[in-house]
Structures are given as C-alpha cells and as structure tokens.
Design a protein with these regions (language model features):
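FAD-binding core/adjacent interface of flavoenzyme oxidoreductases
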Residues: 1-6, 21, 73-138, 199-204, ...
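Conserved N-terminal glycine-rich FAD pyrophosphate-binding loop of Rossmann-like flavoproteins
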Residues: 32-55
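Glycine-rich FAD pyrophosphate-binding loop
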Residues: 21-39, 167-173
Length: 283
C-alpha cells in the first residue's frame, strides 16, 4: 500500500480522493461506526456548494466519491504505528498493514487514560489481545472496553486465560459475551502494581489480575506513534502537513483549530500531495 490514512472524517476522505487522483494505492482505516461529531450533525450550512445537508449525508458523499476513485476502506482501530525501514507497519486490531506513508486524520477526540495506565503499559497492561494474549495463558485477566469490539477480544482471551472479567468503560451491549467471561458491573477508576500483579480499583473495590487489556475507540497520540511531536494535544505540522517524522503527515482537527469541515478537507488534499511527493522520492 502506498498511503495508509488513519481516520474517516472529511480530512481522511479528501486525502484519499487526491491520493487516488495521483495514482497511489490508498486505504482509509477507522473503527466501525466512526465518523466523529460530523456524523451526528443534523444540519451543515457552511460547506461550499451544499446547502442544508446533514453531517451523515456529507460524510457518505465524501466516502462514496473516494471509493469510486478506487480507495479502499478497512474497519479497525489502529493501535500502533511502527517505522520499518522506508515503510510503516500499522497494527490495526488483529491485522498488520504496511504502507510507504501515513496520514493521520483521527479528529480532535482524545481518550482519557486511567491513572496508572500509561505507567503499566507493556508491563501488565496491553491494548492488543492478539499481540500479548499468549503471555497470559492460564492466567487471570480483565478486559476494559468502551464498545462492543471488546466482546470479540474477550472471546479470544477466554481461549487462552484461566478467567476473564469484563468491564464496560462506556455503556454498550454485552449480551454476546461468551460463556466463561464474567461481566462486572463496576466502574474502573485506576490501575497500579500490587503484589506483583495489576491492581484494578473500581468504584466498589480492588481486584488483582495478571494482565489487563484495554480497548477504546481511540488511542493517545503519544502511544500511537513514538516520537510524534504535538502541541497542546494537536499534531505539529508544517504548511505541507508534514509531521515531525519522515513519511508521516496529518490533516483535519487532529492538527488543531479552527475545527471546520472546509479546513479539514483542504488539509487532507495538501497532505495527499505532500505524501505523493514523498513517495516519489523513495524511488
């Protein structure tokens, strides 16, 4: 793949269109049901050329145009991006994708971490069941999830672990949890290291686990891509939408304000052009 675009908002689809017009293979990756605030906007009046269109309709028009041009789409949360020579490896849930350039278009939403979560990441806390599940074979684990995607992950972990407890970070349907996975009606508050295990404190009590797996609809920028420079929670870019790492670009609300659709679309276009120039220089 030439360009992997992370995020399916206006910036992402605009980037995909321009990339395809440049003849580059392109995939747009975002969790199922994503679309940010725009997907819920009842009426948009300030996008040039379209009067009184809903956010959902506008997004679908962007999507259909990009797909008609040959862009691909994949429903998955990108949990980590790793440079690999002149390529990038993207860990997208249970798959690994490779691309020559990456354009980050995830919008402005940022997950709030639990106290102690970042400190224990890689040492008892994981965001990837497929990657780390085998380390907890025959052990006691917990799954903390903000959506139904965690149900599938819990089912996989149940095939390995001795026991799996499931905590909903946000309300969602847990009726399809497999046998052997226990839904716990408590709200996680913090994580810490206790007695050589991960201590999960809730609004009721503390539980000890060998491992804790956390699944959200977004990943903190500092954990998504090591070395990515940010400013006030936004990705720092130049006028060509180049980020601090070679081969990485960003567009839309993820680069900061103003948080406008037209601005996101324009930045997506610029990012695609810059990414195309970068790829051409790779030879």
């Amino acid at each position: 793949m030439d360009i992997a675009i992370v995020g399916n908002g206006p910036a992402g689809w605009s980037c995909a269109m321009t990339a395809r017009m440049r003849g580059l293979s392109t995939v747009v990756i975002a969790p199922a049901g994503a679309g940010g605030w725009l997907s819920g906007a009842e009426r948009i009046d300030n996008y040039p050329g379209l009067l009184q269109v809903s956010g959902k309709e506008l997004l679908e028009r962007f999507r259909q145009q990009a797909l008609a041009l040959g862009a691909e789409e994949k429903s998955a949360l990108v949990r980590q991006i790793m440079p690999n020579g002149e390529r990038f490896l993207l860990l997208a849930e249970n798959d690994v994708l490779e691309a020559k350039a990456v354009v980050l278009c995830m919008g402005a939403a940022r997950p709030v971490l639990l106290p102690g979560e970042e400190e224990l990441l890689g040492s008892g806390v994981s965001y990837c069941a497929t990657c780390d599940g085998m380390f907890y074979r025959g052990k006691r684990v917990a799954v903390l999830s903000a959506s139904t995607s965690g149900v599938e992950e819990a089912a996989f972990l149940r095939s390995l672990a001795e026991s799996v407890d499931y905590y909903a970070l946000k309300p969602h349907d847990v009726s399809s949890l497999p046998e052997g996975v226990q839904a716990v009606a408590e709200k996680p508050r913090s994580l810490a290291r206790e007695q050589g295990k991960v201590a999960l404190s809730t609004d009721r009590e503390m539980h000890l686990y060998d491992g804790v797996f956390i699944f959200r609809t977004a990943v903190p920028l500092r954990m998504l891509l090591d070395g990515l420079e940010t400013d006030g929670g936004a990705i720092r870019v130049d006028r060509s939408m180049r980020a601090s790492l070679s081969g990485v670009f960003a567009a839309g609300d993820v680069t900061g304000g103003p948080l406008q659709i037209a601005k996101a679309v324009g930045e997506g276009n610029v990012a695609a052009i810059a990414a195309a120039e970068y790829i051409a220089k790779l030879g």
